[in-house]
C-alpha cells in the first residue's frame, strides 16, 4: 500500500467503491480480533469514544462495536457505502454513521475522541491536512490506529496464471500484493510512509508497528468479489474490467475453483503528544 495519489485521482478513486458496495462487504477479508484487542489495550481506557475515518461498509466498525465500552462515530463519504454501513450496524445504538468526508467534517461542540481509527482508508485522506485534523479530533494522549490488509495468493502456479491474465489485459497495471509472492515480512514495514509522516508531523509519540498474519479461503466468485472491489479495477473501462475478471475466473477454475489468501495486516499506532 502506497500513498502516491494526487488530489483529483484521490477524490475520484475513494468514491468508486460504492459501485460494488455489497461485493466489497462480502468479498473483502476482515481484520484480526487480536488487532482490535491490541488497539483498545493501547488506549489504556476501560471505555473508548472512537472516530472512524473512511468506515466503508463497516468491516472494521463491526469488530470494534462488538467490544464492550466502545462507542463509534463513523465517517464515510460515499452514500452507497454509508447505506450498507448503516444497515450492517443497525441495532447498535453506540454506532453513529455520518455521510461525509474527514476533511470537511467538524465534530459538534469541538468534541474530541479517545481513538481515531482508519481501516484500509487513510491513504485516501488529504496528506496536507490529515495529521493536523487527527490531532484536532483527538484528546491529548489520544490514540491513532491505522491499518491495512495485504492479500497474497499462496499457490505459486495459480498466482502466476492470474498474473499472466493481468499482464495480457493490463501491461501497465499498477502493482498489487495479490499478484506478488508472499513476503517474509509484511509490506506494511516500519519504514513506510505512515511512520515517516507521523514522526515528521511532530504531534505524535509512541509510534508502534505490528503485524498480523491470517488465512482466508475464497471460491472463484469470492476472488472476483475481492478484485472487483479494488480501486484500480473500478477505474478501468467496463469492457476491459469484465474481460479481465472473466479470464481471471477461468484461470482460478482451471486450478480447482478456489484459493487460499495469505493475509498480512499491518497496524500503526501512535499517541498525540500530551498537552497538545
Across the structure, where does each feature detected by a protein language model lie?
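Class I SAM-dependent methyltransferase Rossmann-like catalytic core
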Residues: 18-29
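Conserved alpha-helix/loop element of class I SAM-dependent methyltransferases that forms part
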Residues: 29-48
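Class I SAM-dependent methyltransferase SAM/SAH-binding core
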Residues: 51, 57-105
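A short acidic, Gly/Pro-enriched loop at the edge of an enzyme's catalytic core
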Residues: 106-116
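A short SAM/SAH-binding and catalytic strip from SAM-dependent methyltransferases
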Residues: 114-128
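A short glycine-rich, Lys/Arg-flanked "PGG" loop and its adjoining helix->strand segment in the class I
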Residues: 130-140
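Conserved catalytic/acceptor-binding region of the Class I
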Residues: 140-213
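Conserved Class I S-adenosyl-L-methionine
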Residues: 187-276
Amino acid at each position: 500500500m502506497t500513498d502516491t495519489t494526487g488530489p483529483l485521482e484521490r477524490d475520484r478513486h475513494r468514491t468508486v467503491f460504492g459501485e460494488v458496495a455489497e461485493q466489497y462487504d462480502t468479498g473483502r477479508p476482515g481484520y484480526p480480533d487480536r488487532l482490535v484487542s491490541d488497539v483498545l489495550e493501547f488506549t489504556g481506557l476501560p471505555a473508548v469514544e472512537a472516530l472512524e475515518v473512511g468506515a466503508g461498509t463497516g468491516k472494521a466498525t463491526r469488530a470494534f462495536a462488538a467490544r464492550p465500552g466502545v462507542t463509534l462515530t463513523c465517517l464515510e463519504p460515499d452514500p452507497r457505502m454509508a447505506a450498507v454501513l448503516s444497515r450492517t450496524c443497525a441495532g447498535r445504538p453506540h454506532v453513529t454513521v455520518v455521510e461525509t468526508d474527514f476533511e470537511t467534517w467538524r465534530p459538534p461542540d469541538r468534541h474530541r475522541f479517545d481513538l481515531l481509527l482508519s481501516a484500509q482508508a487513510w491513504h485516501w485522506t488529504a496528506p496536507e491536512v490529515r495529521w493536523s485534523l487527527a490531532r484536532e479530533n483527538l484528546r491529548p494522549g489520544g490514540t491513532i490506529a491505522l491499518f491495512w490488509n495485504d492479500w497474497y495468493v499462496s499457490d505459486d502456479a495459480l498466482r502466476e496464471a492470474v498474473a499472466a491474465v493481468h499482464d495480457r489485459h493490463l501491461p501497465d497495471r499498477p502493482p498489487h500484493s495479490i499478484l506478488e509472492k508472499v513476503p517474509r515480512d509484511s509490506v506494511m514495514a516500519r519504514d513506510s510512509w505512515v511512520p515517516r509522516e507521523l514522526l515528521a508531523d511532530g504531534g505524535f509519540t509512541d509510534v508502534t508497528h505490528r503485524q498480523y498474519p491470517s488465512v482466508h479461503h475464497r471460491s472463484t466468485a469470492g476472488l472476483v468479489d475481492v478484485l472487483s472491489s479494488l480501486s484500480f479495477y473500478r477505474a478501468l473501462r467496463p469492457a476491459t474490467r469484465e474481460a479481465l475478471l472473466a479470464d481471471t475466473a477461468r484461470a482460478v477454475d482451471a486450478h480447482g475453483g478456489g484459493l487460499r489468501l495469505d493475509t498480512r495486516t499491518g497496524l500503526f499506532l501512535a499517541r498525540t503528544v500530551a498537552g497538545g
